């Protein structure tokens, strides 16, 4: 569904014309999202051996790649043997559950370990402030490592170009995915209760209550008391007009944020699954795949699994829609780019950079997009392979949610040096509300006070 439109079925436009128009509108309405390049929508891209780069210059080296079990790691892993054939560089991989990975990686980096050489990362401010991340501008400017015409940064979504930039213009990461919080619906479950697609938060609550049964929750979202569970709830805060941090102070105890968390708690306490206070993203996804929840809000990247009949019992009745909004306001879902970084202590930095260049190139992105990965490239997003694997309706919803997102508010928290501490405090408060331990006002006021005290030291 396009912004401002009404659709009883909840479907979004899926024609090629409307899809391409959405790409352009994303760039026009939100400057951080890319316009289509003038040369058109090529379904192929120059192969790696067409680049003016000596891919074999680090043959024999081995780089360690670490990350979360995630659509990106699932898509890139099968292609790694091709990278080794191209470069002679071996890649050892270590992918873990996201919560486990994000908890262990900072400890490893803080100890000064030279591995992993390349890693998926989210707490950029912490990594940059502590010197864990290698600055990359110099690598992009070295002609022995980069062929600018072949890599073609103009093909990147504008968010992907702007997102990794630190305040001094240096970049310490390369974006590898694009995602925004998206509403997933089981159309049959809603139709059985004669419920239309909810558009506002109040409508979402009414619908979630109406469709909840003994065997199916009305809605599932993350509520675990840890920062990794924060993206859906942050979208509620942003959509109510709140923010996470402003001027180096935690502000999620504002009236707007408190109202947002109160609604989040009502949804999950009144219509959520049993035990939702322990839910992480994989619990949410599994409930939706198995038909145990009528609705869910989480990453747009779930679409690949949801639309896959081999993994999903609801593939044929699944719908994808824009993030809900407060009456009188537009939706502001949380968005982010997972990024990959080079360890500043790595002994194989140049080989690691070649890997990042290859992994995010046009040719590789077309391959991963055909597997359903929402990459950072316009050419990949507009490819038929991506729309087939990801689903046209899901792609349209994801683009609309990216368009509606506020990149600055997302970066303000993600790039804060103590983002992990802040996000943990936030979700402890949200969890207290969901579990009924405290009111939203008491929980968020206390959480904000603790976080601000910790920031001040």
Whereabouts are the PLM-identified features?
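N-terminal secretory signal peptides
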Residues: 1-18, 41
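Hinge/lid segment of periplasmic solute-binding proteins
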Residues: 44-57, 124-180, 205, 315-321, ...
């Amino acid at each position: 569904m396009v912004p401002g439109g009404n659709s009883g079925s909840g479907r979004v436009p899926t024609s090629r014309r409307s899809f391409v128009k959405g790409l352009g509108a994303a760039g026009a309405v939100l400057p951080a999202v890319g316009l289509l390049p003038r040369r058109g929508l090529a379904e192929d891209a120059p192969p790696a051996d067409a680049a003016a780069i000596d891919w074999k210059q680090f043959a024999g080296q081995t780089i360690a790649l670490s990350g979360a079990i995630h659509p990106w790691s699932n898509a890139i892993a099968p292609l790694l043997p091709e990278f080794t054939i191209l470069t002679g560089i071996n890649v050892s991989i270590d992918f873990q559950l996201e919560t486990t990975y994000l908890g262990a990686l900072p400890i490893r980096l803080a100890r000064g370990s030279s591995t992993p050489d390349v890693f998926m990362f989210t707490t950029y401010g912490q990594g940059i402030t502590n010197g864990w991340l290698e600055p990359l501008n110099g690598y992009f400017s070295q002609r022995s490592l980069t062929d600018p015409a072949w890599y073609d940064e103009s093909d990147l979504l504008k968010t992907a170009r702007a997102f990794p930039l630190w305040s001094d213009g240096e970049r310490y990461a390369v974006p590898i995915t694009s995602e925004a919080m998206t509403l997933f619906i089981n159309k049959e479950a809603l139709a059985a209760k004669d419920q239309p697609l909810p558009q506002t938060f109040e409508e979402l609550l009414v619908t979630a209550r109406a469709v909840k049964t003994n065997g199916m929750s009305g809605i599932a979202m993350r509520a675990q008391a840890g920062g990794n569970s924060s993206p859906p709830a942050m979208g509620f805060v942003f959509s109510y007009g709140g923010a996470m941090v402003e001027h180096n102070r935690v502000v999620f105890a504002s009236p707007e944020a408190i109202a947002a968390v109160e609604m989040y708690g009502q949804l999950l306490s009144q219509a959520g699954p049993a035990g939702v206070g322990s839910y992480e993203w994989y619990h949410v996804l599994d409930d939706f795949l198995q038909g145990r929840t009528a609705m869910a809000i989480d990453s747009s990247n779930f679409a690949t699994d949801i639309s896959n009949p081999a993994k999903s019992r609801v593939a044929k009745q699944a719908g994808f829609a824009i993030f809900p909004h407060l009456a009188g306001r537009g939706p502001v879902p949380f968005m982010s780019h997972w990024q990959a970084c080079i360890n500043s202590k790595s002994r194989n930095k140049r080989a690691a950079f070649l890997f990042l260049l290859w992994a995010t190139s046009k040719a590789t992105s077309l391959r991963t997009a055909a597997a359903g990965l929402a990459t950072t490239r316009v050419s990949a997003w507009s490819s038929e392979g991506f729309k087939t694997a990801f689903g046209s309706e899901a792609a349209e919803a994801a683009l609309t949610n990216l368009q509606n997102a506020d990149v600055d508010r997302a970066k303000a928290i993600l790039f804060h040096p103590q983002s992990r501490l802040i996000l943990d405090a936030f979700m402890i408060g949200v969890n207290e509300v969901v579990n009924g331990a405290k009111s939203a006002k008491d929980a968020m006021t206390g959480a904000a006070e603790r976080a601000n005290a910790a920031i001040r030291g």
